[in-house]
């Protein structure tokens, strides 16, 4: 699987966040609280959802499944106004990304093993310390094997 390389503009997101780890995965809880309220958000760029991970700087240097990171359930907006109660604004910085078109269940770790253990070490890129995110469009079906999503990995040239 070869990604496309894309320069992304800065994006304005509105959503909810929590801290979790791989072992203490609270993704379902996060999304179950967010999805019913998404109609409260105005000026959406598209109907897509953004699942974002904001990792500490040393997260990938010393991987530990108990290490905490910030997870977001969000949507992109054109302008930030009237943020619904209990939600927050997040500015996703501009930068270069490797974008993987993934088809499969959201719980299958093999795609991430491929990206970080096979593709990245043999590419001409290195991981950048910016948020990682997934774009969940109309073909996203969570744990359905026919589900489709885009996985955006922040990169820098060597």
Language model features: what each stretch is:
Residues 1-158:
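A solvent-exposed interaction/effector surface
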């Amino acid at each position: 699987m070869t990604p496309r390389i894309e320069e992304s503009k800065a994006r304005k997101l509105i959503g909810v966040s929590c801290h979790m780890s791989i072992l203490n995965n609270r993704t379902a809880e996060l999304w179950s609280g967010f999805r019913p309220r998404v109609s409260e958000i105005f000026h959406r760029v598209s109907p897509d959802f953004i699942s974002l991970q904001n990792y500490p700087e040393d997260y990938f240097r010393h991987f530990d499944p108990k290490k905490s990171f910030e997870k977001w359930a969000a949507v992109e907006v054109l302008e930030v106004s009237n943020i619904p109660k209990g939600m927050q604004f997040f500015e996703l910085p501009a930068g270069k990304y490797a974008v993987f078109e993934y088809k499969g269940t959201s719980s299958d770790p093999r795609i991430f093993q491929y990206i970080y253990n096979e593709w990245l070490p043999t590419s001409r890129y290195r991981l950048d310390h910016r948020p990682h995110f997934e774009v969940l469009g109309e073909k996203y079906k969570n744990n359905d094997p026919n589900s489709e999503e885009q996985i955006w990995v922040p990169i820098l040239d060597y």
